[in-house]
């Protein structure tokens, strides 16, 4: 795919000598290139541009890779500030550059030789801030597919189209789960009726499990005094990811980016005995984080989100039991939703890097050994990443691969030794001596937004009956003749607390059935002449083409209760 980057760079340089190049790379089988040029490209030009690029590939001659030192490369590319910035960020003093037709480019990962033929399919053009930073210049980004033959290109295009059909953004649009609107703002999702119902279904199940695993529900405001985040350290370290503060009655207030400081105050509001620990708090927290516009991705990466947040305040001797409890909670919930994690990462501290981590060897050794013993007892495979722990404690990440082959974190368990110190949290031991608790941050499913994105991609939108926003659709064969009976049945289903819709369109029966299939509604009830005469007999079918069933009313309700 990097041959596509080199081809595009070379063609741009030949046609627009003043072009400047930003980031490039390969993601999920596609290549992309950021660049600055006076010409603004549009999708309407793609067909001609593809022809030009395919023809130009045959003109790529004398492709040579050369190793040069960093100082020389910075001098060589000094006319291109974006390339020099990228080179400066490289730690190595030796770089590889690629020369084509006597023009040199920084495509350091390219593998030679190039194929004998080259074919390009362009997919998208967009505007992106350099390095995703809104304070930096905006560049154009072209995204495409490169192949060494027409047959390979055709195969890659088909695979790419299938991949995007399974993208949660496409599924969410087709099923009317969520939407975005520029009047609300980029990164601020709007939940449509079905999406709001799906959120509630997920929330109800998770909330019940939180209760069963000993968590207590609390609630805190979305706005807080800036001083709170200065105490927690979030403002110092993450202010660029937070929304700007606002002055209210001589106080600087800020939309919260996380809930842990609030839960610290809940723990602190009264004297705590060692007998009261652990304290487990949970909250559905609305959070705001100022993600760069270039990084926003459907529901996966947004600026406003609701986190099913959990915090455990415990003694150091309780760490193992609490992690085991949290681990089982995460497994219980995610198994119910059909998730098996592709990878579990255990991030540990590096004992040789004292500057990067809290300086308490005994605390690190104790907590990390307790975590590893949990993995061994549960016989769960995991990957150790030494040096990847947070400054304030070790972390467990539960990873899931999306339809676009991107690994995302769904659930987390994070130990925190720092926040209890910052907020001077204390409990009193058997001798009435003040001791500092440990905080364990637990993300069971993460945010509703990211979890639903992963759920839609995993199921392709085919949600099981118990999870479907609409479980049953009532379809009158003839709207004029059968509507009254269909409405009666619809009302009966509502009273049974079954999530039901009524198709009141004037479409023919075949189209109504197809609409239900497209909307992936698990059960369809057909109301015709026979059903109109006796509403105690139900004619139903599944959206996947199952045989039509005729059931008595009580048996149908029992079926929905059992499966839903």
UniProtKB/Swiss-Prot annotation:
UniProt-listed Enzyme Commission number(s): 6.1.1.3
Catalysed reactions, as listed in the record: tRNA(Thr) + L-threonine + ATP = L-threonyl-tRNA(Thr) + AMP + diphosphate + H(+)
Major localisation: cytoplasm
Free-text comment on the cofactor: Binds 1 zinc ion per subunit.
Example of a GO biological process term: threonyl-tRNA aminoacylation
Needed cofactors: Zn(2+)
Compartment list: Cytoplasm
Keywords: Aminoacyl-tRNA synthetase, ATP-binding, Cytoplasm, Ligase, Metal-binding, Nucleotide-binding, Protein biosynthesis, RNA-binding, tRNA-binding, Zinc
Sample GO molecular function, one term: tRNA binding
Any matching Pfam family: HGTP_anticodon
Gene3D superfamilies attached to this UniProt entry: 3.30.54.20, Anticodon-binding domain (3.40.50.800), Bira Bifunctional Protein, Domain 2 (3.30.930.10), Threonyl-trna Synthetase, Chain A, domain 2 (3.30.980.10)
Region ranges (Catalytic): 167-464
UniProt similarity note: Belongs to the class-II aminoacyl-tRNA synthetase family.
Designated name of the protein: Threonine--tRNA ligase
Gene label: thrS
């Amino acid at each position: 795919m990097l041959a596509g980057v080199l081809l595009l760079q070379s063609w741009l340089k030949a046609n627009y000598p003043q072009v400047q190049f930003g980031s490039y790379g390969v993601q999920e089988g596609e290549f992309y290139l950021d660049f600055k040029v006076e010409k603004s490209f549009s999708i309407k030009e793609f067909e001609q541009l593809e022809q030009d690029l395919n023809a130009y590939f045959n003109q790529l001659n004398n492709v040579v890779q050369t190793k040069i030192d960093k100082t020389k490369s910075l001098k060589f590319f000094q006319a291109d500030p974006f390339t020099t910035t990228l080179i400066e960020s490289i730690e190595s003093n030796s770089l590889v550059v690629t020369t084509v037709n006597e023009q040199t480019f920084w495509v350091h990962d390219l593998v030679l030789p190039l194929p004998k033929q080259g074919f390009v399919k362009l997919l998208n053009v967009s505007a992106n801030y350099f390095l995703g930073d809104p304070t930096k210049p905006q560049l154009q980004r072209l995204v495409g597919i490169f192949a060494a033959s027409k047959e390979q290109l055709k195969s890659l295009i088909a695979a790419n189209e299938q991949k995007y059909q399974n993208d949660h953004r496409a599924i969410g649009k087709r099923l009317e789960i969520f939407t975005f609107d520029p009047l609300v703002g980029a990164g601020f999702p709007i939940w449509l009726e079905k999406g709001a119902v799906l959120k509630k279904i997920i929330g109800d199940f998770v909330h019940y499990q939180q209760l069963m695993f000993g968590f207590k529900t609390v609630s805190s405001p979305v706005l807080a005094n800036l001083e709170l985040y200065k105490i927690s350290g979030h403002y110092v370290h993450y202010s660029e990811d937070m929304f700007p503060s606002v002055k209210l009655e001589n106080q600087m207030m800020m939309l919260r980016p996380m809930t842990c400081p609030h839960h610290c105050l809940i723990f602190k509001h009264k004297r705590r005995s060692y007998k009261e620990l652990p304290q487990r708090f949970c909250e559905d927290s609305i959070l705001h984080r100022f993600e760069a516009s270039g990084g926003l991705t459907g529901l996966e990466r947004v600026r406003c989100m609701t986190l099913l947040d959990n915090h455990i305040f415990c003694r150091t001797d309780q760490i193992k039991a609490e992690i085991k409890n949290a681990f089982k909670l995460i497994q219980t919930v995610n198994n119910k939703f059909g998730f098996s994690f592709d990878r579990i990462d255990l991030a540990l501290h590096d004992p040789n890097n004292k500057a990067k981590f809290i300086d308490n060897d005994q605390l690190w050794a104790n907590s990390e050994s307790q975590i590893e013993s949990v993995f061994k007892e549960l016989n769960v495979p995991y990957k150790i990443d030494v040096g990847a722990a947070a400054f304030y404690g070790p972390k467990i990440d539960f990873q899931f691969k999306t339809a676009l082959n991107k690994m995302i974190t769904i659930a987390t368990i994070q130990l925190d030794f720092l926040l209890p110190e910052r907020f001077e949290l204390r409990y009193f031991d058997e001798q009435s001596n003040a001791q500092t608790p440990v905080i364990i941050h637990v993300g069971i499913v993460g945010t509703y937004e990211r979890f639903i994105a992963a759920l839609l991609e995993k199921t392709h939108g085919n949600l099981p009956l118990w999870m479907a926003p609409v479980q049953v659709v009532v379809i009158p064969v003839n709207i004029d003749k059968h509507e009254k009976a269909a409405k009666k049945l619809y009302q009966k289903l509502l009273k049974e607390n079954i999530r039901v819709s009524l198709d009141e369109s004037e479409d023919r029966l075949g189209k109504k059935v197809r609409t239900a299939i497209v909307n992936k509604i698990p059960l369809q009830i057909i109301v015709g002449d026979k059903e109109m005469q006796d509403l105690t007999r139900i004619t139903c079918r599944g959206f996947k083409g199952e045989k039509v069933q005729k059931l008595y009313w009580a048996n149908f309700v029992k079926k929905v209760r059992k499966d839903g």
